[in-house]
Design a protein with these regions (language model features):
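Metal-dependent nuclease catalytic cores that hydrolyze phosphodiester bonds in DNA/RNA
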Residues: 1-83, 105, 109
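Conserved pre-motif I regulatory segment
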Residues: 174-216
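Walker A/P-loop
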Residues: 208-230
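Short, conserved "post-DEAD/DEAH" coupling segment immediately C-terminal to helicase motif II
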Residues: 360-368
Length: 369
């Protein structure tokens, strides 16, 4: 039997396992995507003919019952004085003269993973890692370099993988547990209301066939159960990997929560999270996501993974009350934490804006992040 293949990008691997520091909205919005692309192209246009840009790299790591594929694209692979250089380009609005070797550990980590994979592929004893910082406003450029042995890179890489493996095993254990409960789960009422079964069949077929289903029915006809029950069954059959229940009304959101509670009472195991608007769940007088002002933003990334493990091991329904409880216990932003939880939940209940707004915080999940 072929092992399950689990994929993760090099950047996401590094940012999840090694993240440290604080939430700072000033940094998040500092460079727009288009500016970043232009900055990358500007640096890459200066490469020599023997240098290569946007080089795809991947490494498969086999475990007992799954294979982890780590993949990404190195911004540049350069050659200088018979030495190979992995170039990682980072665009910024910060004065590059203020950037030193300790500026961002994650930048080095990402480049080191590329360097390990390439060194292994080409059987290199050592390789140079270069971080190229490019200011999109004043076009200042700074190059930082470190040389690593293959042994150093291999040790770093497998330490990273071991830390991530713990999360994979936690998630695999949950999915097996969840799917066993879905397989034995039947419609939670003795009989269907008029039209309920027909709607449930339509919804299931729409999911499995990748089609759309538009339905209209009066209040009280059991629409929510007719939608969630087949969606959960499709989840257990691996026809989908996440259910989004989107609504503009708090009352409709609560109906979805109550429906999931009924299903859990009948033996279903399912993780669900409610995404509450930042304005409603922020604990501060002013909505300023900067570490100097907000204690829940300050050091957030130092503590969030510990809080995640606590939640995932002991709870299935993540409502605002529970999220606030962990927010106080671990001193983390409740809004950002709810977004973190959505990555691990089977059902995400949220406002329309989180799906359809181009700037929405859940876009990463929808794009397979």
């Amino acid at each position: 039997m072929k092992n399950e293949l689990i994929k993760i990008s090099i950047r996401n691997l590094v940012e999840f396992v090694l993240r440290r520091g604080s939430i700072d909205s000033r940094i998040k919005a500092s460079v727009r995507a288009l500016e970043g692309i232009k900055g990358h192209k500007k640096i890459q246009s200066s490469y020599s003919e023997k240098d290569r840009a946007e080089v795809t790299l991947k490494e498969d790591i086999d475990f007992e019952d799954f294979t982890l594929r780590v993949e990404g694209r190195a911004d540049g692979i350069l050659e200088e004085n018979k030495k190979i250089i992995i170039d990682e380009i980072k665009t910024t609005t910060k004065n590059v003269m203020d950037i030193d070797y300790d500026f961002n550990e994650l930048h080095w980590a990402q480049a080191k993973v590329y360097a390990y994979i390439y060194s292994k592929e080409k059987n290199l004893d050592s390789i140079i890692v270069q971080l190229t910082y490019y200011n999109v406003e004043d076009f200042g450029t700074k190059f930082l370099r470190k040389e690593y042995s293959f042994h150093e890179l291999r040790e770093f890489f497998y330490d990273l993988i071991e830390k991530y493996k713990e999360w994979i095993l936690l998630e695999k254990k949950w999915i097996d547990f969840r799917n066993d409960s879905i397989e034995s789960f039947n419609f939670p009422f003795k009989s269907y209301r008029k039209g309920q079964r027909e709607l449930a069949i339509r919804v299931y077929k729409a999911i499995t066939e990748g089609k759309k289903c538009f339905a209209e029915a009066p209040t009280g006809t059991g629409k929510t159960m007719s939608i969630l029950f087949p969606a959960v069954k499709a989840l257990g059959a691996k026809e989908t990997n996440k259910i989004f229940y989107i609504t503009a009304k708090t009352t409709t959101r609560e109906i979805a929560n109550n429906t999931l509670r009924i299903m859990r009472e009948k033996g279903l195991n399912l993780r669900s999270v409610n995404i509450t608007a930042k304005e409603k769940c922020c604990k501060m007088e002013e909505k300023k996501c900067i570490p100097e002002y907000c204690p829940y933003a300050n050091g957030y990334f130092d503590r969030v993974n510990i809080a995640l493990k606590e939640a995932l091991k002991h709870k299935e329904e993540y409502d605002l009350e529970y999220i606030n409880k962990l927010s106080e216990e671990y001193n983390i932003c409740p809004f950002e934490f709810s977004l973190e939880l959505s990555n691990f939940c089977d059902v995400v209940i949220c406002d329309y804006n989180y799906i359809f707004d181009p700037q929405a915080s859940l876009k990463g999940i929808l794009e397979g992040k």
